[in-house]
C-alpha cells in the first residue's frame, strides 16, 4: 500500500512538472522566444529550456508548484542548483559552439490546472566569479 502511494505521488509530481514546462514553453513562444531545446541532457547534466531571445541565449529553469504554502517556487533554486545549471550550460555551449551572450532566467508556474500563475524572472542569477 505504501509503495503504491509513493509511486502515485511521484507520478503526479512528474506530471505537474511536465505541465509546468509545457506552459512555460507556450508562455515563452508567445513572447517571441525561439525554443532551441527542452530537457537537454548530457550525462547527468540537464537544462529545462534553452531558448533564443533576440541576440541572447536564455537558459531557463522552470519550477512548478501546486501552491505557495511551502514558499515560492524560485526559492528552491539554491547555490548547488545554480552550480549544476552553470555546468550544464558550459557543456551545452561547448557542444553547440554557441557564441552569444547568455542569461539565466527562471519561470515559476503555480497551480494544478489552467489558468496557471506564471512568472518570468529574467536575469534571475548571474554566474559567480570563482577564484
List PLM regions with ranges:
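Structural motif
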Residues: 44, 57-59, 101, 118
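Residues at secondary-structure transition points
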Residues: 11, 15, 19, 44, ...
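Conserved catalytic cores of phosphodiester-cleaving nucleases, focusing on short active-site segments
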Residues: 28, 47-68, 77, 85
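Acidic-basic catalytic patches of nuclease active cores, encompassing PD-(D/E)XK
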Residues: 1-38
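Mid-chain, well-packed structural core segment of small domains
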Residues: 70-102
Amino acid at each position: 500500500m505504501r509503495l503504491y502511494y509513493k509511486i502515485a505521488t511521484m507520478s503526479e509530481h512528474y506530471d505537474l512538472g511536465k505541465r509546468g514546462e509545457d506552459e512555460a514553453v507556450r508562455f515563452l513562444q508567445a513572447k517571441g522566444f525561439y525554443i532551441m531545446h527542452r530537457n537537454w541532457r548530457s550525462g547527468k547534466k540537464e537544462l529545462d529550456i534553452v531558448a533564443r531571445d533576440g541576440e541572447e541565449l536564455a537558459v531557463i529553469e522552470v519550477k512548478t508548484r501546486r501552491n505557495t504554502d511551502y514558499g515560492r517556487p524560485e526559492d528552491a533554486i539554491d547555490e548547488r542548483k545554480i552550480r549544476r545549471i552553470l555546468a550544464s550550460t558550459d557543456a551545452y555551449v561547448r557542444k553547440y559552439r554557441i557564441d552569444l551572450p547568455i542569461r539565466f532566467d527562471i519561470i515559476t508556474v503555480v497551480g494544478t490546472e489552467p489558468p496557471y500563475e506564471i512568472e518570468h524572472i529574467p536575469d534571475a542569477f548571474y554566474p559567480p566569479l570563482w577564484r
